[in-house]
Curated annotation (Swiss-Prot):
It is a multi-pass membrane protein. The gene is MT-CYB. Heme b b562 binds at H84, H183. GO terms for molecular function: metal ion binding; ubiquinol-cytochrome-c reductase activity. It comes from Cyanoramphus forbesi. Heme 1 (or BL or b562) is low-potential and absorbs at about 562 nm, and heme 2 (or BH or b566) is high-potential and absorbs at about 566 nm. The cytochrome bc1 complex contains 11 subunits: 3 respiratory subunits (MT-CYB, CYC1 and UQCRFS1), 2 core proteins (UQCRC1 and UQCRC2) and 6 low-molecular weight proteins (UQCRH/QCR6, UQCRB/QCR7, UQCRQ/QCR8, UQCR10/QCR9, UQCR11/QCR10 and a cleavage product of UQCRFS1). This cytochrome bc1 complex then forms a dimer. Gene3D superfamilies: Cytochrome Bc1 Complex, Chain C. The lineage of its organism: Eukaryota, Metazoa, Chordata, Craniata, Vertebrata. Binds 2 heme b groups non-covalently. A ubiquinone binds at H202. This is Cytochrome b.
């Protein structure tokens, strides 16, 4: 009998073991779809980004008009730009839901997979930030100025670090050039990190909603989950194209329709919606260095998840008190996102401070305590 090509060919063999004959737990739900959706987001962003880069000019005097030219004169340039800008939003929606799934079902106990995932999130955030600067509108310019300026809070080397990042004494042409270079490079770095992430995942196999070993009940990835993923792709691409065609500027900032002007400060400087929760935490602390540390901690705290797991059960599926705490945390993140979009005045200041305190308290203190309590209730 002739050997099966996909099982014997050196390259096809790798694809086969990762996407076709991969043993998968039979009971994984739609929450396990977001990994593949993130893959589609990454592919779409690289494709649209590459097409946009062919028409973009990384120069302060031409950047804004080159983006306008892409939208007006390049065939389907407006569509490519809208898909790229809104694709970033969908990327973050998917990654936040993916992290939430991992947090809820205890996937962080696969430490290597989880840690590479957190590094992926940080790289994605860096990519989105430098990308937001490229259109060189008012919010692009002032967002870059404010966020890069945060590094000046680092004792002793801060100011030197900021000037080194800027390539001068303010955000100017060298800054835009290097941000474009970084925005082009980082997605490929993300792609390589994704391969590392998947390698670690396939070492242990997928977790499942019950959080117990599924070795006795596994099914091949194809056709069962490839078809299930396809449904997810169709839903997400439908939502993305709907947003890009009907309301492309819904999630953007109107200030970015004005070319960057270093002499005029916008009334309210804020980042894109997906960074607002971290921005609210940054603003809630009056001290600059304290704010920067809280901002970093708001994301880096994810690295501590495996260490803070005190429950005898892996998932929250059968832990009602932890579930209540989880959804309180989710609501708290929505409050932080809302506060981050509001001006710095009463009552938003105190709401932001309380929500920031609640965020860290739930993750660092309440989750371990409640887990231990639930362990005692099992006795």
């Amino acid at each position: 009998m002739a050997p099966n090509m996909r099982k014997s060919h050196p390259l096809l063999k790798m694809v086969n073991s990762s996407l076709i004959d991969l043993p998968t737990p039979s009971n994984i739900s739609m929450w396990w779809n977001f990994g593949s959706l993130l893959g589609i987001c990454l592919a779409a962003q690289i494709l649209t980004g590459l097409l946009l880069a062919t028409h973009y000019t990384a120069d302060t005097s031409l950047a804004f008009s080159s983006v306008a030219n892409t939208c007006r004169n390049v065939q389907y340039g407006w569509l490519i730009r809208n898909l790229h800008a809104n694709g970033a939003s969908f990327f973050f929606i998917c990654i936040y839901l993916h992290i939430a799934r991992g947090f809820y079902y205890g996937s962080y106990l696969y430490k290597e997979t989880w840690n590479t995932g957190v590094i992926l999130l940080l790289t994605l955030m860096a990519t989105a930030f430098v990308g937001y600067v490229l259109p060189w509108g008012q919010m692009s310019f002032w967002g870059a100025t404010v966020i890069t300026n945060l590094f000046s809070a680092i004792p002793y080397i801060g100011q030197t670090l900021v000037e080194w990042a800027w390539g001068g004494f303010s955000v100017d042409n060298p800054t835009l050039t290097r941000f474009f270079a970084l925005h082009f490079l980082l997605p490929f770095m993300i792609t390589s990190l994704v391969l590392v992430h998947l390698t670690f995942l396939h070492e242990s196999g997928s977790n499942n909603p019950l959080g117990i070993s599924s070795n006795c009940d596994k099914i091949p990835f194809h056709p069962y989950f490839s078809l299930k993923d396809l449904l997810g792709f169709m839903i997400m691409l439908f939502l993305l194209t709907t947003l890009a065609l009907f309301s492309p500027n819904l999630l953007g900032d109107p200030e970015n329709f004005t070319p960057a002007n270093p002499l005029v400060t916008p009334p309210h400087i804020k980042p894109e919606w997906y960074f607002l929760f971290a921005y609210a935490i940054l603003r809630s602390i009056p001290n600059k260095l304290g704010g920067v540390l809280a901002l970093a901690a708001s994301v880096l705290i994810l690295f501590l998840s495996p260490l803070l797991h005190k429950s005898k059960q892996r998932t929250m599926a059968f832990r009602p008190i932890s579930q209540l705490l989880f959804w309180t945390l989710a609501a708290n993140l929505f409050i932080l996102t809302w506060v981050g979009s509001q001006p710095v005045e009463h009552p938003f200041i105190i709401i932001g401070q309380l929500a920031s305190l609640t965020y860290f308290t739930i993750i660092l203190i309440l989750f371990p305590i409640i887990s231990s309590l639930e362990n005692n209730l099992l006795k």
